[in-house]
């Protein structure tokens, strides 16, 4: 990978992109940290009996909190233009981001499959939906997330830049390694989970329409919200990843040429947008809660999730998928495995 940079001062466009990234990351931190903390508090303190869905939502909020706790380090990097936290901090921050991204997307997939099974095979779902099974699934999700994020530890390093400055940067032995990492992340962190989510909710929508559920119209709107929110935050990021992978396979170094420079600019904003996805869940909870927010006050999250323990049986009675869907939107968003240092000043200065 090319680790040299131009000595020219950053252009106005680059400064604007960096400022926009700082704004997005600051909003994510300001909204997501208290929002997800409130969700964790609501489930742990306000719910006496936690359903399987509540346990998944709890883990999702914890994953979002983990990635948001790394945001101050990246904000410092963007503001100062240098990485000040050493090699261990570099790898740890990016590894936490990777684990959070995978944990979030796998939790989303698990919740989607759970919903689909509850509608398609309610009796089977009722037998499988135990806290013991949920804990095993959650443990498996976290173990798999830690494993899938390990390439970050192999490729991230701290490289010198200018005088007395350094960058936390991905350094690959070859362009083939860069292509592999980007494609691997796009496939495992978006494509396969997204296909599972779409298939699950498409099946739910088809079955609800066939059974003429009273709340199917509302459920349909929520399903669309779930899928669009998921895609809006992650599709652009992974499209850029795949475009970069294509350039790597063609032997073109990152950030070089007109296309490479534009991809580097876009990547700054899209990585910050992916961080912002970790703050959107509490907002979706509030939107899905409807009247509960007004009637239950600070306890609305607990009220929202209280009915999910009997989703399977209530689904058979034909009236509860509104509750099921209400818990769904909160599941759709994870943290990015690439931090803002992935589109570092090293690349941005090459745009001049």
Curated annotation (Swiss-Prot):
Region (Disordered): 310-352
Coiled coil: none
An annotated GO BP: phospholipase C-activating G protein-coupled receptor signaling pathway
Post-translational modification: Phosphorylated by GRK6 upon leukotriene B4 binding; which promotes desensitization.
Biased composition (Polar residues): 310-326, 338-352
Cellular localization per UniProt: Cell membrane
Cytoplasmic compartment residues: 43-54, 114-138, 200-221, 290-352
Glycan attachment residues as annotated in the record: 2, 164
Topology in the lipid bilayer: Multi-pass membrane protein
Result, substituting residue 310 to A: No effect on affinity for leukotriene B4 or on desensitization by GRK6
Keyword Secreted among record annotations: no
A single GO cellular-component term on record: plasma membrane
Tissue distribution: Expressed at highest levels in heart, skeletal muscle and at lower levels in brain and liver. High level of expression in lymphoid tissues.
Chain ranges on the Extracellular side, renumbered to this chain: 1-19, 76-91, 160-178, 243-268
Cysteine disulfide links: none
Transmembrane parts of this sequence: 20-42, 55-75, 92-113, 139-159, 179-199, 222-242, 269-289
Keywords in alphabetical order: Cell membrane, G-protein coupled receptor, Glycoprotein, Membrane, Phosphoprotein, Receptor, Transducer, Transmembrane, Transmembrane helix
Keyword DNA damage listed: no
CDD domains referenced in this protein's UniProt entry, alphabetically: 7tmA_LTB4R1 (cd15121)
One MF term in the entry's GO annotations: leukotriene B4 receptor activity
Role played: Receptor for extracellular ATP > UTP and ADP. The activity of this receptor is mediated by G proteins which activate a phosphatidylinositol-calcium second messenger system. May be the cardiac P2Y receptor involved in the regulation of cardiac muscle contraction through modulation of L-type calcium currents. Is a receptor for leukotriene B4, a potent chemoattractant involved in inflammation and immune response.
Family membership: Belongs to the G-protein coupled receptor 1 family.
Name of protein: Leukotriene B4 receptor 1
Organism name: Homo sapiens
């Amino acid at each position: 990978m090319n680790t040299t940079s131009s000595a020219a001062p950053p252009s106005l466009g680059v400064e604007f992109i960096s400022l926009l990234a700082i704004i997005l990351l600051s909003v994510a931190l300001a909204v997501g940290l208290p929002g997800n903390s409130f969700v964790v508090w609501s489930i742990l303190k306000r719910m006496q009996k936690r359903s399987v869905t509540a346990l998944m939502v709890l883990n999702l909020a914890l994953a979002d909190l983990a990635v948001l706790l790394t945001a101050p380090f990246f904000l410092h990097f963007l503001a100062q233009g240098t990485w000040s936290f050493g090699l261990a901090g570099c790898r740890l921050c990016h590894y936490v981001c990777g684990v959070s991204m995978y944990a979030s997307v796998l939790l989303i997939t698990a919740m989607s499959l759970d919903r689909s099974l509850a509608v398609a095979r309610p009796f089977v779902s009722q037998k499988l939906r135990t806290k013991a099974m949920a804990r095993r699934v959650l443990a498996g999700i976290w173990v798999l997330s830690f494993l899938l994020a390990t390439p970050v530890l192999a490729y991230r390093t701290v490289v010198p830049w200018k005088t007395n400055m350094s960058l936390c940067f991905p350094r690959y032995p070859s362009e083939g390694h860069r292509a592999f990492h980007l494609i691997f992340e796009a496939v495992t962190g978006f494509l396969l989970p997204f296909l599972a989510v779409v298939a699950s909710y498409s099946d739910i929508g088809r079955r609800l329409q066939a059974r003429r559920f009273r709340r199917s119209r509302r459920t349909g709107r929520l399903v669309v919200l779930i899928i669009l929110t998921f895609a809006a935050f992650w599709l652009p990021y992974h499209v850029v990843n795949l475009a970069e992978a294509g350039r790597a396979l063609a032997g073109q170094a990152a950030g070089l040429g007109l296309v490479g420079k534009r991809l580097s600019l876009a990547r700054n904003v899209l990585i910050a947008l992916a961080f912002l996805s970790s703050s959107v869940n509490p907002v979706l909870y509030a939107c899905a809660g409807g009247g509960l927010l007004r009637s239950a006050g600070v306890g609305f999250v607990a009220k929202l999730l209280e009915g999910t323990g009997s989703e399977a049986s209530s689904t058979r009675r034909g009236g509860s998928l509104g509750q099921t869907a209400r818990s769904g939107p909160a599941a759709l968003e994870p943290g990015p495995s690439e931090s803002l240092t992935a589109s570092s000043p090293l690349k941005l200065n090459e745009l001049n």
